Amino acid sequence: KNFGFANETTVVAPGINGKMDEVRSAYGLMALKHVDVAIESRKRVARRYREALKEVPGIHLFEDKEGVKANYSYFPIFIDERMYGMSRDTLYEKMKNAGVYGRRYFYPLISTFSTYRGLDSAGKDNLPEAYKMAERVICLPMHHALSEDDVERVIGQIIE
């Protein structure tokens, strides 16, 4: 709430100062005119990823929820190493070596940071699902300007 400060001089946790100046605010307001087009483009990318990856053993996808309007800014997949045949980290490196940059979101977990590591609440026994997901999730490249060829390259890295 106060940028990680407990008092005027004591920082107890990482924090962020998310204030924005007028120029960036004005730019953001101008960009809002194009947000619907960008979301629709990302939705097309998400549909193609979903269509191509839905039957791949060991790849688990989030489904769109009825009544929720997604902005498609991320496309996470979950890797079941046993079924897929390789770990998330192995796939990440394979993709990176081919010039395809996914992101290992939620990794490392904040609970493993030195600030939190010693807390009882941060232990693996207390957060089993968080630790499991942190080792399995990778977000595929997602941008409104991804070309069809780019999307097919990403898919190819996962399927081959």
Predicted regions span which residues?
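PLP-dependent aminotransferase class I/II
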Residues: 1-160
